[in-house]
Amino acid sequence: MIQYSSKFNNAKVLVLGDVMLDRYWFGATNRISPEAPVPVVKVQGIEERAGGAANVAMNIASLSVPVALHGLIGQDDAGRALDKLLNSHNIQNHCVALDSHPTITKLRILSRHQQLLRLDFEEGFHHVASDSLLAKLEQEITAYGALILSDYGKGTLESVQQMIQVARKAGVPTLIDPKGTDFERYRGATLLTPNMSEFEAVVGHCKDDDEIVEKGLKLIADFELTALLVTRSEKGMTLLRPNQAPFHLPTQAKEVYDVTGAGDTVISVLATAIADGRPYEEACYLANAAAGVVVGKLGTSTVTPTELENAIHHREETGFGILAEDELKRAVEQAKQRGEKIVMTNGCFDILHPGHVSYLENARKLGDRLIVAVNTDESVKRLKGESRPINDLNARMAVLAGLASVDWVVPFAEDTPQRLIGEILPNLLVKGGDYKPEEIAGSQEVWANGGEVKVLNFENGCSTTNVIKKIQASK
């Protein structure tokens, strides 16, 4: 079974940005105030959590990864509360405490798991000299595998361009969750992680995935970025890089409880994985899995290694996901014993596009379980040429396994999956395109076992070749 690991043995991350304290008041609400048409909350519990850049650092620390935090706080109770929180999680707290400004604090009042009100206590740190932060960064940057600049628009990162240049000179990747529409500030960064609304505020409305890719690649070129990760809420996330195919990941969130701090979790896991030397695709997969966990929690939260491990192998525990051939045989046998109808299809799935997604959804509707057999990299080269595949086998299978319509993904090394289909013997064999049923590899084996063979149509205009042509045309 192909696995991603939630252990980051070689990672070390530095976080610099807008530090905040999140306070939560929890209580019961049973009546409306006689003074005004507002609920009366009887406070029954108070909780304090790290927010902003401090929450980013907490996310990294929760993964058992060494992390240091640089930022600005006040010499006040909130600042001392933050210091205590950070120290309790073994975070190196290098925040500068100022007597001229209070610590940025956000107070949320909740009842029955619903947020009723948020109160912000802040003056921000605009026009506060950040020379000390810059000097500290220059001294320490080479000791880290990644730098996160956590920008909430509160002023700590007024020297962000100089900070980026310090990291570039040291050869350390810089990741930024951007704020506002002035992306010129982030020129030369390694990776930006805007959400969809932030992305469209800069590039304009995008009517479809193709336009997201086109405008995203232009943004990368305009601001000399290495990569761009657009987080798209219920549509997952999209990784873009020059001269490489877009990497789309569907959301893994089962239930969205609270999105507070989800962006912090994404960039934390991304940076940690990159600092650990993981490929960008794997880093995004892990970040996506972590985000799916954290939005199921209340308030500013973190993800533990165990939670991340369970999330990235969430189907493994029930026999689903990416399986080796012998594991798939056992899973299919058990499913057949339960009376489930097994549907099977195959392909290269080099660059997953809407046509693929629609096709797989339609195939899944024809039965209870869907198996997708995927050509290995060498098999794709023999079929498509030396320039293919664009995405390697692990990346292609990871994306397919993330689709709700797909139950099992299995690789095969031959030019056709005929042998594999003969071993699995699905109840229904499905293929997309203009084939005649008798031309489909494995059809004879399925028919001989009393099964069915069906041809489904792809959406018009959707093809991997067309996607590649659009990418080449955008260069």
Curated annotation (Swiss-Prot):
Residues binding ATP, per UniProt: 195-198
Reactions that this protein is recorded to catalyse: D-glycero-beta-D-manno-heptose 7-phosphate + ATP = D-glycero-beta-D-manno-heptose 1,7-bisphosphate + ADP + H(+); D-glycero-beta-D-manno-heptose 1-phosphate + ATP + H(+) = ADP-D-glycero-beta-D-manno-heptose + diphosphate
Entry-linked CDD domains: RfaE_like (cd01172)
Segments of this protein annotated with the region Cytidylyltransferase: 344-475
Enzyme Commission number, as recorded: 2.7.1.167, 2.7.7.70
Listed PROSITE patterns: PFKB_KINASES_1
Disulfide bond listed as a keyword: no
Highest taxon listed in the record's lineage: Bacteria
Biological process according to GO: ADP-L-glycero-beta-D-manno-heptose biosynthetic process; lipopolysaccharide core region biosynthetic process
GO cellular component, one term: cytosol
GO molecular function: ATP binding; heptose 7-phosphate kinase activity; heptose-1-phosphate adenylyltransferase activity; phosphotransferase activity, alcohol group as acceptor
Active site (catalytic residues): 264
Positions of region (Ribokinase): 1-318
Keyword set, alphabetical order: ATP-binding, Carbohydrate metabolism, Kinase, Lipopolysaccharide biosynthesis, Multifunctional enzyme, Nucleotide-binding, Nucleotidyltransferase, Transferase
Keyword Transcription: no
UniProt-listed InterPro entries: Bifunc_HldE (IPR023030), Carboh/pur_kinase_PfkB_CS (IPR002173), Cyt_trans-like (IPR004821), PfkB_dom (IPR011611), RfaE_dom_I (IPR011913), RfaE_dom_II (IPR011914), Ribokinase-like (IPR029056), Rossmann-like_a/b/a_fold (IPR014729)
Pathways involved: Nucleotide-sugar biosynthesis; ADP-L-glycero-beta-D-manno-heptose biosynthesis; ADP-L-glycero-beta-D-manno-heptose from D-glycero-beta-D-manno-heptose 7-phosphate: step 1/4; Nucleotide-sugar biosynthesis; ADP-L-glycero-beta-D-manno-heptose biosynthesis; ADP-L-glycero-beta-D-manno-heptose from D-glycero-beta-D-manno-heptose 7-phosphate: step 3/4; Bacterial outer membrane biogenesis; LPS core biosynthesis
Pfam families, alphabetized: CTP_transf_like, PfkB
Biological role stated in the UniProt entry: Catalyzes the ADP transfer from ATP to D-glycero-beta-D-manno-heptose 1-phosphate, yielding ADP-D-glycero-beta-D-manno-heptose.
Family per similarity comment: In the N-terminal section; belongs to the carbohydrate kinase PfkB family. In the C-terminal section; belongs to the cytidylyltransferase family.
Subunit structure and binding partners: Homodimer.
Protein name from the UniProt record: Bifunctional protein HldE
Native source organism of the sequence: Actinobacillus pleuropneumoniae
